Regions:
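Short, contiguous acidic/charged loop-to-helix segments that flank catalytic cores in large enzymes
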Residues: 49-54, 78-80, 125-128, 147-152, ...
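Single conserved hydrophobic/aromatic residue that forms the stacking wall/gate
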Residues: 188-196
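A donor-sugar binding/catalytic signature common to diverse glycosyltransferases
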Residues: 109-155
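Conserved catalytic-core segment of nucleotide-activated headgroup transferases in glycan assembly
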Residues: 16-104
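Conserved nucleotide-diphosphate donor binding/catalytic pocket of glycan-assembly enzymes
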Residues: 1-16
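Short, conserved active-site loop motifs that form the nucleotide-linked donor/cofactor pocket
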Residues: 10, 100-101, 168
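Hydrophobic/aromatic ligand-binding patch that stacks against planar heteroaromatic rings
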Residues: 65, 136, 160
Length: 196
């Protein structure tokens, strides 16, 4: 529908618009959550998007997710002190324990892909989706939860999920996004309890 807004000729590729390097390898050595300040017994939501993509609206949804999933934390890329302060202040105002938000420092791409394997579910941002960060998560074996917008920037993760056959993790709206996050967390934790 947005094609009329582009002066360039659009070339449609099968499955997804994004071309990725299939030769990138991820270290297969065992990784410990404690090395990254992560708890062993919690569901780990993550978002490694640049902080400007974390809008008040999407952060409010993440707060609701944390409230509905008591055995979870969220792991967010830390870009600067101001963004950390703002995210922590909102968490505090929402009466959620400080230890449920863990900041990740910037690492080399190779080391980042390695640590990403520790996350259980990547939470996408909206209206500007994850692009390379969503690809990185999927490449590391971490499913991405997104919801489909109307613009190119708000449909990137939808495109990537479709190419991976993860259509069930494309929500139609904010409520379904919240419900899916809670359901995935609950299902994962129940499976862990059963296998213990």
């Amino acid at each position: 529908d947005s094609e009329r807004f582009y002066s360039e000729k659009i070339i449609y590729m099968p499955d997804t618009y994004q071309v990725n390097d299939p030769t990138i390898k991820i270290d297969s050595q065992k990784i410990k959550k404690e090395n990254y300040g992560l708890p062993d017994n919690k569901f780990i939501f993550c978002s490694f998007n640049q902080n400007y993509k974390i809008t008040p609206s999407i952060y409010n949804i993440w707060i609701k997710i944390l409230k509905e999933t008591k055995d979870s934390i969220i792991w967010i890329l830390s870009e600067n002190n101001k963004s950390r302060e703002n995210l922590l202040e909102k968490l505090n105002l929402s009466q959620i324990d400080r230890d449920r938000l863990i900041f990740a420092e910037k690492l080399s791409h190779k080391d980042h892909l390695y640590r990403l394997k520790l996350a259980d579910l990547f939470l996408d941002t909206f209206p500007c989706n994850a692009h390379t960060t969503a690809s990185d998560a999927l490449r590391s074996g971490v499913p991405v939860l997104t919801y489909k917008g109307k613009t190119f920037a708000s449909r990137v993760a939808t495109s990537l999920n479709y190419s991976f056959g993860l259509n069930a993790l494309v929500a139609k709206d904010e409520k379904e996004y919240l419900d899916l996050a809670v359901a995935v967390s609950y299902t994962h934790l129940r499976a862990h309890e059963t296998n213990s």
